[in-house]
Amino acid sequence: MATMPGLPMFGHGQVEGFEEKYGMEYRRPYRDEAPDAELVERHGREIFPLLKKRYLFADVERFLLYDFVAPDGSVNENVFAYSNGTAGERALVLYNNAYARADGSIRVSCPYAVKDSGGKKLETRDLAWALGLVPGEGRYLLFREERTNLWYIRRSAELARSGLRVHLEGFGCQVFLDAHEIEDDAFGHYRALHDRLGGAGTGDVAAAIQDIFLADLYAAFAEAAGPALVRRLCERLGAFEPKPAPEEAQPAAEPPTEAKARAKAAPDDAKADR
């Protein structure tokens, strides 16, 4: 609802998870219900950020629906897939309205009516057009999944040719935002990132590229600080281990004087007298 065109309507108590439903004519609720803290937290984490992006979803000028095509070529009617956006920012939404998981791809939109001089005609658009891609060698699409905050990368030419392949768990959804096309640099950074991720996502694109191209340096540091080197250093330092300091000499016992000798013997003399 938060990503569909038009005005989203929230019922009373929907965010809090209240079961009692009543209209504006009610002065007070009949039930004393407590808000569902987990449901409120999920709305704050998953729904409210999308409501702040309503400018991407409210209009219909760029709204397109897609058939979700399964690997066997059939259309999975349980999956809702659509794109929308503005001239400079695009969004793509997929939702699986079933318990069974869904695997498939989207490439071409469903036909929609367009007015022309002779009345109306049906047209379709492909996903590459919807995302503003200019397919070509060395061009890539970067886009972020809102719920997981992971970035994904795909070849623009592959998206135009085969579409976007998606896996959705039962009642799962994916909302892709911040989609933008980039051209690879002379060092092939984005090609290397695409090949390394293999379709998976990353939390930080720049850090992932850095990890790839500094992998040899990281390995050298890891080897330098590895157990073998530490063992050799310990062995080397052990050869020059300082000798323990000699124990301090105890002061020589003072020779007993005649008075001390008599005092020491006094208890024994007292016992003898008894």
What are the functions of these language-model segments?
Residues 2-5, 9-10, 14-274:
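Carbohydrate-interacting/catalytic domains
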